[in-house]
A protein has these predicted regions:
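Structured mid-to-C-terminal alpha-helical surface segments
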Residues: 1-164
Length: 164
């Protein structure tokens, strides 16, 4: 929830949590390997945005991996990142940047792959969640311990649809 007075008086605006946005972006980077995803992901890593909440971040990445992909990449294989070519950086990324800093593509690829490899070591319960999800059995309680989160996710439309 963000409160802003940009329109002359304070109003509340519901927003998606940054962790959820970056969990979805991490999955996008792993699967579609777009230049913008690599740039955003590495900025997140450089800012150490979730360094104090890595377990929750991993769980969010796992959740988004299950609801967004046709086939769950439960090993979090990052080889698609290698396919990002500098021509895509020039055509897709540079036009949306205010300043065209030197962009070390190979260094950024390596940084992203190492961060993901370090973070994405699912626990036994998290692996069980993914296996069951692939078998069309949705059990958010295997992924999250917090009852409030579990209850909010229990009726997640995309998860329910994918498990039909």
């Amino acid at each position: 929830l963000v409160v802003t007075d940009a329109f002359g008086e304070p109003i509340k605006v519901r927003t998606v949590a940054a962790m959820e946005i970056f969990a979805a972006k991490t999955n996008a980077l792993i699967s579609r390997a777009a230049a913008r995803d690599l740039y955003d992901f590495c900025n997140m890593a450089d800012m150490k945005l979730f360094s104090d909440a890595e377990n929750m971040f991993r769980k969010c990445i796992i959740f988004y991996a299950t609801i967004s992909a046709n086939k769950v990449n439960k090993n979090f294989d990052t080889s698609a990142i290698d396919s990002i070519a500098f021509s895509k950086i020039k055509s897709d990324l540079f036009p949306v940047l205010a300043v065209r800093d030197k962009f070390n593509l190979e260094g950024k690829k390596q940084q992203a792959k190492e961060y993901i490899a370090s973070l994405m070591k699912p626990t036994e319960a998290e692996m069980d969640y993914m296996e069951r999800f692939m078998a069309k059995e949705y059990k958010p309680e295997l992924l999250f311990e917090n009852t409030e989160i579990i209850e909010r996710l229990r009726n997640h439309p995309m998860a329910l649809w994918k498990c039909k």
